[in-house]
């Protein structure tokens, strides 16, 4: 009986504790409000990240953290790798406005896919009518202002290779019908109207697609056979996989703006119209 009473008392105590336990979470933006830290370029590491010695870490905001603290350890690791990261911090251009990754027919995806079409045509010597990439392959936005190499590398981190695929018009139409029904991806060279989940209109070069005509498609190897549930190479008349990665195509293109004295800028247009959603 005594043992039973002890067990009952213990269970009651646990019940009381479980009822009174409370946890709260506070969300802070990663804005450097504790330390004044900002993202460094290759030539401003002390100003952006602060300085460190054997005894303490002094942040850009003036706060001092002793050796052995968690902040000291994090700062030491971040500062130590900066020489290796210096090439990625190289300023390669200037963007006149922010370009957000907002799916198909946003300025950023249009900028990438339209250039990809040009580069695939240049590399393969084939006529390219349509371009196609997946939205998920674009990982971050392009900020306004100075653009560093890491902005592009972080945006396009995957080892996706440029490809050329020749498709008959009926297969190209089927590809866009599937995307309209599931999830439209980023494209160029076409005008698409979606009504609900149904492809209403597909124009290439301003004309309706001819089922028997062969069209050139610029894409990436990830989408050839099932990536993001897309099979661009299904029923391909011709397939060329290049040895050029998307990032290796886009970096020189981004740098070319500064070389000719221009700012990086692009636009959304009317290539995609969605009705009934």
Regions found by a protein language model. Name each.
Residues 16-18:
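C-terminal motif of bacterial Sec signal peptides marking the signal peptidase cleavage site
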Residues 85-103, 229-234:
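Acidic/histidine-rich, surface-exposed loop or edge segments in extracytoplasmic proteins
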């Amino acid at each position: 009986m005594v043992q039973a009473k002890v067990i009952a008392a213990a269970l009651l105590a646990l019940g009381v504790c479980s009822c009174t336990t409370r946890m709260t979470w506070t969300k802070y933006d990663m804005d450097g409000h504790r330390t004044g830290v900002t993202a460094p370029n290759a030539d401003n590491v002390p100003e952006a990240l602060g300085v460190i010695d054997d005894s303490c870490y002094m942040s850009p905001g003036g706060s001092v953290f002793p050796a052995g603290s968690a902040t000291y350890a994090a700062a030491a690791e971040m500062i130590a790798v900066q020489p290796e990261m210096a090439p990625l911090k190289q300023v390669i251009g200037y963007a006149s406005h922010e370009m957000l990754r907002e799916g198909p027919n946003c300025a950023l995806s249009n900028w990438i896919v339209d250039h990809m079409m040009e580069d695939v045509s240049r590399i393969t010597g084939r006529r390219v009518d349509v371009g196609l990439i997946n939205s998920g392959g674009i990982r971050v936005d392009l900020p306004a202002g100075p653009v560093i190499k890491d902005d592009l590398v972080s945006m396009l981190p995957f080892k996706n290779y440029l490809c050329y695929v020749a498709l008959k018009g009926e297969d190209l139409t089927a590809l866009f019908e599937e995307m309209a029904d599931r999830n439209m991806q980023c494209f160029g060279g076409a005008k698409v109207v979606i009504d609900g989940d149904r492809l209403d209109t597909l124009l290439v070069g301003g004309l309706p697609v001819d089922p028997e005509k062969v069209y050139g498609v610029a894409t990436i190897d990830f989408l050839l056979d099932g990536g993001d549930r897309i099979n661009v190479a299904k029923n391909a008349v011709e397939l060329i996989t290049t040895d050029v990665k998307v990032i290796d195509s886009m970096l020189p293109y981004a740098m070319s703006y500064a070389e000719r004295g221009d700012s990086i800028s692009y636009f959304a247009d009317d290539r995609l119209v969605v009705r009934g959603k």
